């Protein structure tokens, strides 16, 4: 069995540096996410910053499908415990919503 010794855990989770032009993606997601959030809020199908714990970032956004949900998808965003938050990823809930699932997008303490 091969074991890898990790000496710098911050570096181990900094996967963005391993993606060519990876730094451009967070900015590219801002507008689609904001538009998606505004659209669902206008339809009364979104609730923002609901609490699931006592820490300041223990919040989630809940997006509801049209009609009764078939279930719940819980999305824990990437960011590798280093940066970003739930608001960058909201538009990724569209597929689950289109198939009738509610989506909870979690933020967490970095």
Predicted regions: what they are:
Residues 83:
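Conserved HGGG/HGGXW glycine-rich cap/lid loop of the alpha/beta-hydrolase fold
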Residues 87-106:
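Short amphipathic alpha-helix adjacent to the substrate-entry channel of hydrolases
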Residues 80, 108-110:
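Alpha/beta-hydrolase active-site loop signature
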Residues 3-68:
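N-terminal cap/lid segment of alpha/beta-hydrolase-fold proteins
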């Amino acid at each position: 069995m091969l074991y890898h010794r990790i000496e710098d855990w911050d570096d181990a989770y900094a996967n963005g540096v391993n993606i060519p032009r990876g730094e451009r993606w967070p900015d590219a997601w801002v507008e689609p996410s904001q538009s998606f959030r505004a659209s669902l809020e206008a339809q009364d199908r979104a609730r923002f910053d609901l609490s699931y714990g006592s820490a300041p970032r223990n919040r989630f956004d809940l997006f509801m499908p049209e009609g009764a949900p078939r279930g719940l998808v819980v999305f824990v965003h990437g960011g590798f415990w280093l940066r970003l938050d739930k608001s960058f990823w909201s538009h990724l809930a569209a597929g689950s919503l289109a198939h009738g699932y509610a989506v909870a997008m979690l933020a967490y303490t970095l």
